Amino acid sequence: MDVNPTLLFLKVPAQNAISTTFPYTGDPPYSHGTGTGYTMDTVNRTHQYSERGRWTKNTETGAPQLNPIDGPLPKDNEPSGYAQTDCVLEAMAFLEESHPGIFENSCIETMEVVQQTRVDKLTQGRQTYDWTLNRNQPAATALANTIEVFRSNGLKANESGRLIDFLKDVMESMDREEVEITTHFQRKRRVRDNVTKKMVTQRTIGKKKHRLNKRSYLIRALTLNTMTKDAERGKLKRRAIATPGMQIRGFVYFVETLARSICEKLEQSGLPVGGNEKKAKLANVVRKMMTNSQDTEISFTITGDNTKWNENQNPRMFLAMITYITRNQPEWFRNILSIAPIMFSNKMARLGKGYMFESKSMKLRTQIPAEMLANIDLKYFNDSTRKKIEKIRPLLIDGTASLSPGMMMGMFNMLSTVLGVSILNLGQKRYTKTTYWWDGLQSSDDFALIVNAPNYAGIQAGVDRFYRTCKLLGINMSKKKSYMNRTGTFEFTSFFYRYGFVANFSMELPSFGVSGINESADMSIGVTVIKNNMINNDLGPATAQMALQLFIKDYRYTYRCHRGDTQIQTRRSFEIKKLWDQTRSKAGLLVSDGGPNLYNIRNLHIPEVCLKWELMDEDYQGRLCNPLNPFVSHKEIESVNNAVMMPAHGPAKNMEYDAVATTHSWVPKRNRSILNTSQRGILEDEQMYQRCCNLFEKFFPSSSYRRPVGISSMVEAMVSRARIDARIDFESGRIKKEEFTEIMKTCSTIEELRRQK
């Protein structure tokens, strides 16, 4: 039967139909192949926006650098990065005038953080450029490798465990004439297999020492590796994102801490808050503008879009901002904060994997690594790629491109928000000195601008002034993509405002369903998502009840745990039927053991085990939650667990759910296919790391031991703990004298070995 889809909307207010226009059902698009082309696009575009700047050469690396700061102001509407230093400083001064003491207080807060932060802060985060291996690694491994190299080069400040001391090592490493690193490489040998008598390739992993001179080391320390951003919906073209190395990360963290502290005190900032708190902040600004425009004024709102925010920002501008913000602070603090923008002014973009070539006739595939792009004959490339390579060639050094202007995606979100808010702040009447005035909201590159004026001409004048002020600070409001409505209807960071925020339910669609962690977590996350959407996103009771039934169905199909009395045959049905038949109280069985579903929309907040506990047979309780049962996982689980939810846009969100440890809370093992590759050496390092940590946790069994504050090593801590435990166990009669003596002897041997080392 054909249904005219417009009939669906006859009774629905227009604003509630927003959900239907979002591209958020189904799988998001992922990128394949290399990101080299996207990265070259970014580098070339960034230079084009600043092309009328001044060229200089970096004295250490020889990289050509373009500086657009205080460059010629644009005559047209094309995006450009010519920010004017004096304007930025003045905007900062006015921001401070409107918020007395804001910079001072934020500096004091940040100084405390700087002195307390430990180096393990840098292990957070996913992929990180590992400069020792010249490719991406998990953050913890990259940090471990960096520290290992530093120590073998005699840089030992990091041993205190404080981040600031690690950064001292980073600064000292940049003055070294050479740095010695260990690289992993792979040897292949053809040998004859004794059994099958065939030739096979044997791989062995070797480690070798390798010296980097000052120039090579600096290039690596200043390198951002690039990847393609995955899972971006609603875009035809992919784009490149950057991941910085460990030398840059620590400095960026402190700058962002300062900027975050400032953003928290600014009512126009959409960061660092999120969710309902953000909506409340926005609603306040709107209310303020509406209240003041009741009789004489008209009020309009621009749903704003900036052209290429990151590519027109400039690290030199951020340096000026930081210099101003910290002007009355101690020298050490000012120095440590100014290093991140200085490093970004000298950054190099790694071009990624390079290009893949296929010859259809000869069935050959070959990869052209990025390092070769500087001197390969361009006849092999198509027109668009040829143009890109020609343009980027003058900037290339060792397969990386010098990229002085621009900030890669997501590096200084907080600080760039401060810059944006400083323009919104200038809209007060005491600064505009005329009849129009403005206010608004800023969250990284997204903004909403509310302009009030006595008449339309005033509104137009206000918008023009805002537009031109932005240009002075290197921000380019897009006239094509921004649109204006009477205040009361606008969109900001995918929140749709229409006399109040409209629930944009489609954005939550990807997080419904079975997550695939394990039976216990999935049940808990599934009902929590439904509960949260009833609270935050206008999910009504009838729809929620339906969502719940669909979820349970989905869950049963995923884990093949249909009810014990069902006719559906699956791999597990034999076991489940057996359990069903021998259980007296069938209502007590968990859904994942073939039990009935007892959830409805009134009890979503109760973990399933608690909901059914009173209904369970005693022996079932004993098997399900007995800590001595080898299948009950107590390793990861605390009373509240975190799941990473992927919302339809924006970063992955952490979602809390209640976790009860049962036989269903298993943790799956990792895929081992990595063992045959050149990564194997790294994996072995990682396993050793893992073993040490596991051993350490055995000595300190509480899952939440406090971080050791002293400088004693892990080994010393374990030895002293072993001695204390042994003495207590011996005195209480839990162990025999011989065992006690043996433990003490082992401890002394370990200490002796450490001394000899």
UniProtKB/Swiss-Prot annotation:
Annotated region (Disordered), positions in chain: 53-82
Reaction(s) catalysed (UniProt annotation): RNA(n) + a ribonucleoside 5'-triphosphate = RNA(n+1) + diphosphate
Motif (Nuclear localization signal): 187-195, 203-216
Keyword Nucleotidyltransferase: yes
InterPro entries: RNA-dir_pol_NSvirus (IPR007099), RNA_pol_PB1_influenza (IPR001407)
Region of interest (Promoter-binding site), ranges: 249-256
Functional summary from the UniProt entry: RNA-dependent RNA polymerase which is responsible for replication and transcription of virus RNA segments. The transcription of viral mRNAs occurs by a unique mechanism called cap-snatching. 5' methylated caps of cellular mRNAs are cleaved after 10-13 nucleotides by PA. In turn, these short capped RNAs are used as primers by PB1 for transcription of viral mRNAs. During virus replication, PB1 initiates RNA synthesis and copy vRNA into complementary RNA (cRNA) which in turn serves as a template for the production of more vRNAs.
Subunit relationships: Influenza RNA polymerase is composed of three subunits: PB1, PB2 and PA. Interacts (via N-terminus) with PA (via C-terminus). Interacts (via C-terminus) with PB2 (via N-terminus); this interaction is essential for transcription initiation. Interacts (via C-terminus) with human PKP2 (via N-terminus); the interaction competitively inhibits the interaction between the RNA polymerase subunits PB1 and PB2.
Protein name: RNA-directed RNA polymerase catalytic subunit
Gene (UniProt): PB1
